């Protein structure tokens, strides 16, 4: 297979968890986010299932890197790497035919999940995502034909990228406003999600909430304070 550097390493790390017990670092991470005990138990039960849902990973692969040009059939594709949704998301751009294979990095209707995970609790993937959106705006023509991994092909890439940027910036504004009174990560769901959060998407919603909170912290717009039980409370920074 042809892949970037980080993806195979992350996949092997996840696959290595198969059949293992949930680590205490993960339990502390979700407890700090405000998980109730029944959701903590669900995390423990579901941990280590990744390897059961994917094919066996190859023992070797061909690494592809940013800026590399790959020939597939009669077309030449330039590699553009995005971040935020995944630590390294490979996209392909054919300048001659004005086609961009975006995968999950640029979708026409929904915004890809951008989450903080227990393995890197202080990460700032939302800023990485915003940087990647601006990078794609600079690298692609607006009328490029975008081939996403979900929904239909589309054009007007610059408009869609700006919509994604504006959506996350607006989300952070709402989270900051909500945190005028101290909130846990699980308390800021209403500021970010219109749909109902269920047991099935609770983990993704939590990871995305922490991504917005970590980005706000990096911008010195909120502060985080742990309580005696290890739960993190977020408060808007004073003006």
Question: What role is predicted for each listed range?
Answer:
Residues 1-71, 98:
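Active-site HxH/HxHxD metal-binding segment of metal-dependent hydrolases
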Residues 12, 108, 116, 194-195:
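A short linear boundary/processing microfeature
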Residues 31-47, 60-64, 143, 202-223:
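Short flexible/disordered coil segments
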Residues 39-61, 69, 76-172:
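Metallo-beta-lactamase
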Residues 64, 86-87, 228-231:
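Short acidic/glycine-enriched loop/turn segments that link adjacent beta-strands
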Residues 65, 71, 83, 235-237:
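Residue-level detector of conserved, well-ordered beta-strand and adjacent loop positions
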Residues 72, 92-94, 224, 235-236:
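Conserved hydrophobic "DFG−1" position in protein kinase catalytic cores
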Residues 173-239:
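C-terminal regulatory/interaction regions
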């Amino acid at each position: 297979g042809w892949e970037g550097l980080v993806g195979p390493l992350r996949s092997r790390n996840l696959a290595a968890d198969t059949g293992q017990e949930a680590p205490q670092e993960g339990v502390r991470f979700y407890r700090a986010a405000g998980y109730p005990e029944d959701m903590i138990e669900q995390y423990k039960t579901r941990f280590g299932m990744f390897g059961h849902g994917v094919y066996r990973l190859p023992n070797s692969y061909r690494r592809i890197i940013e800026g590399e040009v790959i020939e597939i059939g009669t077309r030449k594709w330039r590699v553009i790497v995005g971040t935020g949704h995944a630590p390294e998301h490979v996209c392909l751009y054919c300048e001659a035919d004005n086609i961009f294979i975006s995968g999950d990095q640029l979708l026409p209707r929904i915004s890809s999940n951008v989450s903080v995970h227990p393995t890197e609790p202080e990460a700032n993937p939302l800023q990485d995502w915003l940087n990647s959106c601006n990078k794609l705006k600079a690298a692609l023509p607006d009328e490029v034909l975008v081939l996403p991994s979900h929904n239909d092909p589309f054009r007007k890439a610059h408009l869609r990228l700006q919509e994604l940027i504006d959506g996350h910036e607006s989300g952070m504004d709402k989270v900051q406003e909500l945190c005028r009174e101290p909130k846990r990560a699980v308390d800021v769901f209403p500021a970010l999600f219109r749909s109902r959060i269920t047991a099935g998407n609770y983990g993704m919603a939590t990871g995305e909430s922490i991504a917005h909170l970590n980005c706000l912290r990096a911008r010195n717009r909120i502060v985080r304070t742990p309580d005696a039980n290890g739960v993190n409370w977020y408060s808007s920074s004073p003006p």
